[in-house]
């Protein structure tokens, strides 16, 4: 199950580490029609090890950095259960391969999709302020923190946030 809704509130105001959001409904609507046709009924493999590039940061924060791998297969295009709108359900961190495509075709297709998802006209940047709260629908947005705040990167700023996530439905 994915997380239906996520909310985050600042406790120690970060100087950097803005949050980026990308609209996956609009990403689907504006995606090249040839790519849409190619992926509309396909599934992709998602892996928890996609975040392994953070392992050194985990080691500094947690003291170990051990990460177990979990993988799952999800539709690339899902239907939002409340709006009925089609949304892209892939992301550059966790999506590793399109099922029923060879590696080269999968990599090329995913690269085009990921570049499309990052277009400025599909994204917004949320700048944290004292006691700010951000709440989003995980089913229809791609989100990530700009990682310019980790202590090991020479900035040394504390980032403390409270997070809540509400379990959602299975992607379909």
Please describe what each predicted stretch is.
Residues 12-133, 138-172:
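Non-heme Fe(II) oxygenase catalytic core, chiefly the N-lobe of the double-stranded beta-helix
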């Amino acid at each position: 199950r994915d997380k239906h809704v996520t909310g985050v509130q600042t406790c120690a105001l970060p100087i950097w580490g803005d949050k980026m959001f990308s609209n996956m409904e609009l990403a689907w609507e504006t995606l090249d029609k040839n790519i849409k046709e190619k992926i509309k009924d396909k599934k992709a493999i998602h892996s928890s090890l996609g975040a392994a590039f953070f392992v050194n940061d985990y080691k500094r924060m947690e003291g170990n950095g051990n990460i177990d791998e979990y993988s799952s297969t999800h539709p690339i295009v899902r239907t939002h259960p409340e709006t009925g709108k089609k949304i892209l359900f892939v992301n550059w961190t966790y999506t590793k391969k399109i099922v029923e495509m060879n590696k080269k075709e999968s990599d090329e297709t995913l690269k085009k999709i990921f570049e499309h998802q990052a277009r400025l006209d599909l994204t917004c940047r949320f700048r944290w302020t004292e006691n700010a709260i951000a709440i989003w629908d995980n089913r229809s947005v791609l989100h990530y923190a700009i990682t310019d705040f980790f202590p090991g990167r020479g900035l040394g700023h504390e980032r403390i946030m409270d997070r809540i996530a509400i379990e959602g439905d299975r992607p379909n």
